Amino acid sequence: MRDQLWPGEADRLWHRRTEQGFSTIPRTLPLVMTLIDDLKGKGKDTSRVYLDLWCRQMDDSFVEVTDEDAFAYSCGYSTPGRNVRTWRERIDILRDMGFIGVRPNGSRRYGYILLYHPHKVVAEVQKSGKVSLEWWGAFAKRATEVGAVLEPPSAA
């Protein structure tokens, strides 16, 4: 179908099997990011930090924080002096929500990050009653479309 609608465009497209620099991410990630934004405080653009972490992991859910300035800039935090502080605040929010684990590396407080299975985290958040029925419906539909198996939701 694609080639019928865009003939001759194949050489302009990203092909994960022939390119370097790709990452495997859950197909439900946009909805998980929406939930993160729904649950965090106003003005705390946390979901793009979560996306950046997923793009940095190498299919092992593990990220070594090698340069906090570069991580912050990648997430859109470019103001010197505030960029790293803002990034760290968002990391703390993701940790407190249960989406990631954080461990130090020597004297560096944010040395390593572990990305937990987002569907398992979502199930825990849903059990706490913080997930809207609208979001859960959209998430369950998308998860079913991509073949993901979800824990049954708590009775509301």
Each model region followed by its residue ranges:
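Short recognition helix of helix-turn-helix/winged-helix DNA-binding domains
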Residues: 1-69
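Short, cationic/aromatic linear interface patches
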Residues: 12-13, 103-104, 111-124
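Intrinsic-disorder-associated interaction segments
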Residues: 18-28, 80, 125-132
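Winged helix-turn-helix DNA-binding recognition segment
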Residues: 56-113
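Short, amphipathic alpha-helical interaction segments positioned at domain boundaries
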Residues: 118-156
